[in-house]
């Protein structure tokens, strides 16, 4: 059986890079438009895949492995920027996870923790990326402040306080209603929002509280040609 070649992708020298310091705690978010040359080939690769699987973690949808050529493009383009913005050098990154991702979980099927902004890890030396391979009509990503604690990020020193505050809300019957958060609520304030745009990359610390902008009326299509397709990447210390 013939093996399809991996998509050819590389950093776009004309990419537009912006670094924002969001919220009162001024956590960095990097937004890169027109990130890669060959992004269309990535979308075609995802559409051709038959291996999207139900996610076993808290991602609300389906995932499939991104190609090795994508990882190589990240390796070739981002280390210098990451060190300048986040103070993290390549030797601190022990593993990288890159996955095609599709939001497919309907609001009524969400676990309560999927209805609120989340952190990906408690290590500020770990980073997350979302690379949109869809348009703005499918929703971007927002960053949030937890009102009771004032936290906009949750590191190891804040974890117990944050989880304790959420537990207190649950005991008091203040659970979020079924559905995705997409703006201000009694518990959380939106402090920054980025639209999806084809070939836009967002890069931020795993500790930052964030959530996808999944609006009412969203079509939870499982076809990557039609759904909210992205590549989600984690740069991890272990």
Regions found by a protein language model. Give the residues of each.
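Fe(II)/2-oxoglutarate oxygenase catalytic core
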Residues: 1-238
């Amino acid at each position: 059986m013939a093996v399809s070649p991996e998509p050819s992708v590389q950093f776009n020298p004309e990419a537009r890079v912006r670094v924002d310091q969001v919220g009162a705690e001024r956590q960095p978010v990097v937004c890169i438009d027109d990130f890669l040359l060959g992004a269309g080939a990535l979308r075609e690769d995802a559409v051709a895949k038959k291996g999207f699987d139900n996610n076993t973690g808290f991602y609300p949808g389906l995932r499939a492995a991104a190609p090795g050529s994508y990882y190589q493009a990240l390796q070739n383009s981002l280390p210098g920027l990451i060190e300048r913005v986040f103070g993290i050098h390549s030797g601190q990154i022990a593993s990288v996870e890159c996955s095609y991702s599709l939001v497919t979980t309907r609001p009524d099927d969400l676990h309560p923790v999927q209805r609120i902004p989340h952190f990906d890890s408690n290590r500020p030396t770990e980073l997350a990326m979302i690379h949109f391979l869809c348009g703005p009509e499918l929703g971007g990503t927002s960053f949030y402040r937890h009102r009771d604690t004032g936290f906009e990020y949750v590191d190891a020193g804040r974890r117990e306080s944050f989880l304790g505050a959420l537990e207190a809300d649950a005991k008091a019957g203040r659970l979020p209603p079924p559905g995705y958060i997409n703006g201000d609520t009694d518990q959380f304030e939106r402090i920054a929002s980025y639209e999806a745009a084809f070939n836009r990359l967002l890069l931020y610390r795993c500790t930052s509280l964030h959530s996808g902008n999944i609006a009412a009326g969203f079509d939870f299509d499982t076809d990557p040609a039609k759904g909210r397709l992205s590549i989600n990447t984690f740069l991890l210390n272990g």
